[in-house]
Amino acid sequence: MRTIAIVGKPNVGKSSLFNRILMRRKSIVDDQPGVTRDRIYDIGNWLTRSFMLIDTGGIISSKDTYQDNINEQVLFAINEANTIIFLVSAKDGINNDDKKIAKMLKEKAKDKKIILVINKIESEKYYLNEGELYSFGFGKFFKISAEHGIGMGDLLDELVKDMPIQNNLEKQERFKFCIIGRPNVGKSSLTNTILGEQRVIVNAEAGSTRDSIDNDFNYYNKKYTIIDTAGIRRKGKIVESVEKYAVLRTKKAIERSQLILLVLDGSEPFKEQDEVVGGLAYNANIPTIIIVNKWDNIINKNSHTMEMVKKQIRSQFKYLSWAPIVFVSALDNKRIHTIFEAIEFVREQAMRKIATSLLNDVVIKANAFQEPPPFKGGRISISYIVQVQSQIPTFVLKCNNPKFLHFSYARYIENEIRKAFGFDSVPITLYWQDKNKKLRGE
């Protein structure tokens, strides 16, 4: 699949163009320069052609904490790309930063296709000299308005004209999981270690990752997509509009995932924010693995330390009692393999299908062995159970009247199912239904 990178100085509309090509809001857009810090990836489609699109941070000469990292990210993107969109702004005109980028592209991307694109032509005033644009040496250029969609058809035709027709089946085959956690627990370091490269900017300042980033990779011939997300802070501390949108992005990333890696910082006491983020994982009702990061930073460890930390986690995160716990040191690349062992272990449980006859044998016996308590004027009696298709093990239980069900008895039946069929590391869902009501498809 061909790769296209969008580069340019800050605030020329790179993220707006990225979103326009994808026809959805993937990159954060704000009139504040420097909003995009990392490389953002997604697959675009035009005229039955598929391509990987990369949004990058703005290149400038600056003493900003992140600027050297941003410039490095852009160079990574240029190296990955087959085609580069060099974006400038009709509204702001050409300045020294544009000229430096043009010079850099001639040096670093001399063997690649470079398309000069003039954005923001909806502006009433132009500050561009076309002779100056031709002097860059990139030949024909395209005038567009990413915000309003003007000129996009011609640009997209140019981008895909030499591309082969490609489908998107590979993307669909990948197992997708996301990394979540409060800021500065090491989510980006973990992503970088897994991917084996510096794809996500890592900085000691909490909140240095603002976008969620899809990264495709293979691990021992298995295909994965990992989503690195913005760290979630307590709502009262989020003041920037961009940060608010990043929190929403994290929640959306969870919705797109098949599994969650909840990262905790093992080198310090767990915080209230950790429990808040854990609540998001619980509410998502999908498989979750708890990752205790920075394990090597814990001093004076002994043979009992790991078990003590596990007990502490089980106490603070009671609602994730089924989630496996893995201990790693992302920066030192230690015990990373245990994450994938846990992922595959959990995947197998989540996909496990139980024969209806076996289910009924276990549940009907459990119902007879422990008589349910009377509740709301009646007593529950289970007639039948069947597993239904879902992302996690999900069961429909037919009974005489669901209103007679007490939560403690529902928990008893759930535990019996877990024990009998080995569902000890995934969430499971039970739906209690009146036996006279038909299931869809019956």
Swiss-Prot record:
Record carries keyword Transcription regulation: no
Amino acids binding GTP 1: 8-15, 55-59, 119-122
Domain EngA-type G: start-end pairs: 2-167, 175-351
BP GO annotations: ribosome biogenesis
GO molecular function: GTP binding; ribosome binding
Residue stretches making up the KH-like domain: 352-436
Keyword Nucleotidyltransferase: no
Positions with a binding annotation for GTP 2: 181-188, 228-232, 293-296
Xref: PROSITE patterns: G_ENGA (PS51712)
Entry keywords, A to Z: GTP-binding, Nucleotide-binding, Repeat, Ribosome biogenesis
Record text on subunit structure and interactions: Associates with the 50S ribosomal subunit.
Function: GTPase that plays an essential role in the late steps of ribosome biogenesis.
Similarity comment text for this entry: Belongs to the TRAFAC class TrmE-Era-EngA-EngB-Septin-like GTPase superfamily. EngA (Der) GTPase family.
Protein name per its UniProtKB record: GTPase Der
Organism: Ureaplasma parvum serovar 3 (strain ATCC 700970)
Origin organism lineage: Bacteria, Bacillati, Mycoplasmatota, Mycoplasmoidales, Mycoplasmoidaceae
Gene, per the UniProt record: der
